[in-house]
Amino acid sequence: VLFRSREKALEKVLPYQQDDFKGLFEALEGNPVTIRFLDPPLHEFVPTDEADIKKLADAQGKTVEQIKTIIASLHEFNPMMGHRGCRLAVTYPEIAKMQTTAVIRAAIEVKKAHPDWTIKPEIMIPLVGDVKELKYVKKFVVETADAEIKAAGSDLQYEVGTMIEIPRAA
């Protein structure tokens, strides 16, 4: 049930992400664009105001206490090193897949509109702490990107990488 509700939420977010990425590609007119995938921990996206929590509970058909329990479960002791960035994509690959879809669709759209521009998205997977994390996330990012490119009949090129931000990753 939770997976389906996440999928529905991501379907709603996809066009907004795609429009944002399209705007970046257009603003940079063919210059390199690095898109850093979702980095903040999930608790930064949940309501804190009682009225907003009540609205969310009503929309989800849950009690305020159930929503508060979910919110509390997302709180982290050390959010700077916790469940965010690459680790978030490991737990919820559908988020990174949605972002990949949005990036690639936006790039294909801008490339069609401006064939003289060099559109080559650079996708950054953030906060990698171990090569296994990067390999795991990169695999489904590449699969998603390649499927979108094939479906569109495009020859779009792209890169997937990371920035070493955590000492143990070096």
Role assignments for model-derived ranges:
Residues 1-170:
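Conserved alpha/beta-domain cores
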